[in-house]
From Swiss-Prot:
Keywords: Isomerase. The keyword Isomerase applies. The active site is at residue 103. Catalyzes the reversible conversion of ribose-5-phosphate to ribulose 5-phosphate. The lineage of its organism: Bacteria, Pseudomonadati, Pseudomonadota, Betaproteobacteria, Rhodocyclales. GO terms for cellular component: cytosol. It comes from Aromatoleum aromaticum (strain DSM 19018 / LMG 30748 / EbN1). This is Ribose-5-phosphate isomerase A.
């Protein structure tokens, strides 16, 4: 199987968590695109979706799936999203697609976070994938200096602006042994909107696509 086929297998497995009448939280990225396409086949059974990005919202709407405002709902049973890396404690690096802030908001609201990815994303220690940090534009230089101070090598994502009108710097060279502590530390830097560590709110269920099939792992 190709990597894309593995992504699709994980995404289709997540449809088992979608119940009749449910509002579904939808993430962003290539794996989630497969989930959205699968969701289209059962769109008559759901009440709609909450999207973590404009790109996912457009894909949902193209399939005729209603996209709802998060502020207009009181309960979000499930959120389905991918990860750039996920460790054994279900802490993740996310934000390769630049939607980390909205992803983190929707994940915080959801009762259950289903992470869908292929086996290459499972790691022993986070940090090989550069950590995205969303920053207010006027704070870019200051935030970059602070990131260097803690041992990172920040690189501006050239030509990219988030759905919120901000910049992304990707931080290389971090071996993240304490993801919860680092998530908090980075978010305390003035000018940082949020960072791509999903540790304080990690995944509840991991659907990990391997050549032998999709493994279902549940957080302790």
């Amino acid at each position: 199987m190709t990597q894309d086929e593995l992504k699709k297998a994980a995404a289709i497995a997540a449809l088992d968590y979608v119940e009749n009448g449910m509002i579904v939280g939808v993430g962003t990225g290539s794996t989630v695109n497969h989930f959205i396409d699968g969701l289209a086949g059962i769109k008559g059974r759901i009440a709609g979706a909450v999207s973590s990005s404009e790109a996912s919202a457009r894909r949902l709407q193209a399939h005729g799936i209603p996209v709802l405002d998060l502020n207009d709902i009181t309960d979000l049973p499930v959120y389905v999203d991918g990860a750039d890396e996920i460790d054994g404690g279900f802490c993740m690096i996310k934000g390769g697609g630049g939607a980390l802030t909205r992803e983190k908001i929707v994940a915080a609201v959801a009762r259950r976070f289903i992470c869908i990815c292929d086996a290459s994303k499972k790691v022993a220690c986070l940090g090989r994938f550069p950590l995205p940090v969303e920053i207010i534009p006027m704070a870019r230089a200051y935030v970059e200096r602070e990131l260097v101070r803690i041992g990172g090598r920040p690189e501006l994502r050239e030509g990219f602006v988030t759905d919120n009108g901000n910049l992304i710097v990707d931080v290389h060279g971090l071996m993240i042994t304490s993801p919860r502590a680092l998530e908090t530390e980075l978010n305390q830097i003035v000018g940082v909107v949020t960072n791509g560590l999903f540790a304080r709110r990690g995944a509840d269920v991991l659907l990990l696509a391997t050549l032998a099939g999709v493994e279902r792992q549940v957080a302790n």
